[in-house]
């Protein structure tokens, strides 16, 4: 393992230069991998719009809110379908007409597991606005994760998406924190299970991991441009069969396809000897 780590660090600067000069890639991107507290990457300290990756730090804030207020995952809120955005990605819209009671567990599963934008905004409404999420990130010690906008606000003005931003390096550090705290309480354990069962982005980092590995992750996708490209992100925890883990984050600004995320992640794994 020590030899692998040393080799990875030696080739990092050469790999980074090659990545910068890679004219075959259409996307501007930042990516990094953390293993054994060591981070290597390219543009890992640059800011990128999180898009729906934002729903991960939001979920951590929701867990803190529920815990502090003595509330359970099975507590409910009544949702009126007429109050929800109708022209956004929202699987929950197909579940009901009129009014329906949703548990916080259901809203977290919709937001994290299916990236439902209405579910995310309901969590903002009942468990703390964007500024509460950012404040919680600061409390945990993460200063390069910024949350200022709801999904509805970004939907109205897509250029505002950058106001929910992070650096790839800070996101892997937050995921590392989560890895070590996932069993602290039932809320975090539920978030872990939900992200492990995530149904989005299967052609992104999941397509690049070793066949025997598992992933706990959250994806994000921006608004498509007239040219047919869009920001695509993925960040997650890779669980290796030997019991070890690695944290990976890939953020792009105008990716032509999900396969680009897998390609970048595959390079990271190869440099770290995970393939």
Which stretches of residues belong to each language-model region?
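Active-site SXXK
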Residues: 49-77, 111, 248
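Short, conserved catalytic-motif segment at the N-terminal edge
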Residues: 25-47
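Structured C-terminal helix/loop/strand segments within mature extracytoplasmic catalytic/sensor domains
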Residues: 18-26, 39, 125-126, 130-131, ...
């Amino acid at each position: 393992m020590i030899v692998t780590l040393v080799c990875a660090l030696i080739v990092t600067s050469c790999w980074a230069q090659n990545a910068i000069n890679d004219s075959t890639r259409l996307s501007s991107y930042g990516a990094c991998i953390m293993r054994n507290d060591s981070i290597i990457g390219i543009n890992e300290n640059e800011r990128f719009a999180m898009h729906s990756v934002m729903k991960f730090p939001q979920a951590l804030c929701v867990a803190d809110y529920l815990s502090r207020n003595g509330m359970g995952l099975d507590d409910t809120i009544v949702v009126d379908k007429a109050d929800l955005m109708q022209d956004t990605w929202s699987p929950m819209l197909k579940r009901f007409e009129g009014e329906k009671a949703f548990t916080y567990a259901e809203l977290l599963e919709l937001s994290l597991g299916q990236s439902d934008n209405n579910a995310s905004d309901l969590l903002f409404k009942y468990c703390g606005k964007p500024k509460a999420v950012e404040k919680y990130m600061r409390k945990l010690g993460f200063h390069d994760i910024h949350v200022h906008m709801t999904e509805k606000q970004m939907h109205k003005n897509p250029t505002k998406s950058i106001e929910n931003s992070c650096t790839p390096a800070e996101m892997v550090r937050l995921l590392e924190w989560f890895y070590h705290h996932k069993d602290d309480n039932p809320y975090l354990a539920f978030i872990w299970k939900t992200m492990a069962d995530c149904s989005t982005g299967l052609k992104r980092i999941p397509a690049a991991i070793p066949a025997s590995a598992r992933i706990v992750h959250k994806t994000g996708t921006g608004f498509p441009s007239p040219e047919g490209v869009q920001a695509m992100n993925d960040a997650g925890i890779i669980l290796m069969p030997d019991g070890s883990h690695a944290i990976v984050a890939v953020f792009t600004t105008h990716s032509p396809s999900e396969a680009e995320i897998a390609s970048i992640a595959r390079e990271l794994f190869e440099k770290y000897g995970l393939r």
